[in-house]
Amino acid sequence: MMTAKAVDKIPVTLSGFVHQLSDNIYPVEDLAATSVTIFPNAELGSPFDQMNGVAGDGMINIDMTGEKRSLDLPYPSSFAPVSAPRNQTFTYMGKFSIDPQYPGASCYPEGIINIVSAGILQGVTSPASTTASSNVTSASPNPLATGPLGVCTMSQTQPDLDHLYSPPPPPPYSGCAGDLYQDPSAFLSAATTSTSSSLAYPPPPSYPSPKPATDPGLFPMIPDYPGFFPSQCQRDLHGTAGPDRKPFPCPLDSLRVPPPLTPLSTIRNFTLGGPSAGTTGPGASGGSEGPRLPGSSAAAAAAAYNPHHLPLRPILRPRKYPNRPSKTPVHERPYPCPAEGCDRRFSRSDELTRHIRIHTGHKPFQCRICMRNFSRSDHLTTHIRTHTGEKPFACDYCGRKFARSDERKRHTKIHLRQKERKSSAPSSSVPAASTASCTGGAQPGGPLCSSNSSTIGGGSLGPCSSRTRTP
């Protein structure tokens, strides 16, 4: 059966649906009772409001048969039977649904209307029997044979709907789940195989095995994989990451471990904006980390990697003032540089260790963010501030902040020069302040300006330029 969920208005002309019948079947005097207007005013209210008074389920069911019976229609107060011309066009409404008597052809188990058939007789026939019934299943099972007279039936056969509501085909791999892999013992156990075969999802198609299942070298790297991370190495890797870390104890030649890195707590504090450990003020960050980190981490790195055994190369960038004498006496600098051609001496061993890294190119401090290496820990500390945006050094004059103390020192010199200019400004601004205009009432030959009495450097000023005439 043809179905539709939406309620539509369909204009129908009576003369187009019926066959021509003989004029002598029924008396002519009974024709006036056959013309009825179902909806005298179709524009009043919504379609559902008009249909609520016709039937309990909001639908009109008309079954026109060939026998002559009296007209029996329950009309509401708004729908009164009125005589209408023979070929008058009227509007009817109805709901259509799939007949559930065809199994598999309907997607709705409970249909709204099983069969909807409208038998419309031409005006020359006798008054037809129009019955409104809520149960339409008692109608004729064959809608095409409703009567010997002309019948307009909307129906659709079963084969026309099979392609619309046909069930999906079964999975193509439903019965061959156990034949996908010839030898599943190489990869899965028997229990796993039986469990996977009962899954609802179809398994992937089978492919030929590249190697026999008994080949012990199928995955040669698996047995040796735990050797890369022994338990002792894992404890060292997940231990406290600080400047006093010892050299990597695992004898792995293929695994190269980088030198001591910046503590994650330091980067986390910088990233979250919290104060780093050991800092109490804007200038305490650079002052505390500078002397503390080089003495401890530099000594540990020197002992771990033995930078003295590395070849010493000459410094690519020599000192700006190589012959400048040091302020510290020689006897107070007992640590000379062992590099050939370098006359530098230091009073502390950690200073010598940092200096030797210049010759060896050793950079044991690595940034965890960009993996850049540095030879000094304080250089790494200032470099991390470029990632975190930390600027702990503020200017005392304008409040501008800097990431390095030398940048603040260089900026402070600008304020000092401006202060010197302001102090020398009053002496240079006296001539400009002493130059005054003449009184407006003075004439060209009159007395001198009032500013003539002012003196600069003991000398008296001449008359104003406006009164001075050149010969």
Swiss-Prot record:
Please provide one cellular component term from the Gene Ontology annotations of this protein.
cytoplasm
Q: What PTM annotation applies here?
A: Ubiquitinated by WWP2 leading to proteasomal degradation. Acetylated at Lys-246. May be deacetylated by HDAC6, HDAC10 or SIRT1.
Give a short account of what the protein does. Answer: Sequence-specific DNA-binding transcription factor. Plays a role in hindbrain segmentation by regulating the expression of a subset of homeobox containing genes and in Schwann cell myelination by regulating the expression of genes involved in the formation and maintenance of myelin. Binds to two EGR2-consensus sites EGR2A (5'-CTGTAGGAG-3') and EGR2B (5'-ATGTAGGTG-3') in the HOXB3 enhancer and promotes HOXB3 transcriptional activation. Binds to specific DNA sites located in the promoter region of HOXA4, HOXB2 and ERBB2.
Give the protein family: Belongs to the EGR C2H2-type zinc-finger protein family.
What is the annotated localization of this protein? Nucleus
Zn finger (C2H2-type) location: 335-359, 365-387, 393-415
Which key words tag this protein in UniProt? Acetylation, Activator, DNA-binding, Metal-binding, Nucleus, Repeat, Transcription, Transcription regulation, Transferase, Ubl conjugation, Ubl conjugation pathway, Zinc, Zinc-finger
- From the Swiss-Prot or TrEMBL record, give the protein name: E3 SUMO-protein ligase EGR2
Residue spans of biased composition, Low complexity class = 127-143, 424-437
Subunit composition and interactions: Interacts with HCFC1. Interacts with WWP2. Interacts with UBC9. Interacts with CITED1. Interacts (via phosphorylated form) with SFN.
Protein's organism: Sus scrofa
Pathway(s) this gene product operates in, as recorded in its UniProt entry:
Protein modification; protein sumoylation
Biological process terms from the Gene Ontology for this record are: facial nerve structural organization; positive regulation of DNA-templated transcription; positive regulation of myelination; positive regulation of Schwann cell differentiation; positive regulation of transcription by RNA polymerase II; protein export from nucleus; protein sumoylation; regulation of transcription by RNA polymerase II
Q: Name one GO molecular function term.
A: zinc ion binding
User: Is-annotated flag, keyword Transmembrane helix?
Assistant: no
Please classify the protein's predominant subcellular localization into one broad category: nucleus
One Pfam family here: zf-C2H2
Keyword Nucleus set for record: yes
- Residue stretches of biased makeup (Basic residues): 410-420
Spell out the residue ranges making up region: Disordered: 127-177, 273-301, 313-336, 406-471
Amino acid composition bias (Gly residues), ranges on this chain: 280-289
Q: Which residues carry this modification: N6-acetyllysine?
A: 246
Q: What is its EC number?
A: 2.3.2.-
